[in-house]
Amino acid sequence: MDDDAIEIPITDTLDLHPFRPAEVRDVAREYLLEAHARGFTQVRLIHGRGIGVQREGIRALLSSLEIVIDFHDADASGGGWGSTVVLLAEPKE
């Protein structure tokens, strides 16, 4: 087991701010796969506003995952363009 492994609670929101930029895509991928396996059909990834590097990396990841049906900016109360709402496919039984 990796000594650096961090257990992330699986809720409908993942804040990516605590993670190093090099970890963000892997963390998001693992989170999305686990959220999907647990039956979540909508989640929110908080990547921040900044200059958009993390946002674009997250969106490239989302485009590559078969479990992702769609994604879009959150509404203003959910973080606006600093967060991405992700619609996930129903898990297969």
Feature annotation, model-predicted:
Residues 1-93:
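Long, charged, low-complexity intrinsically disordered regions
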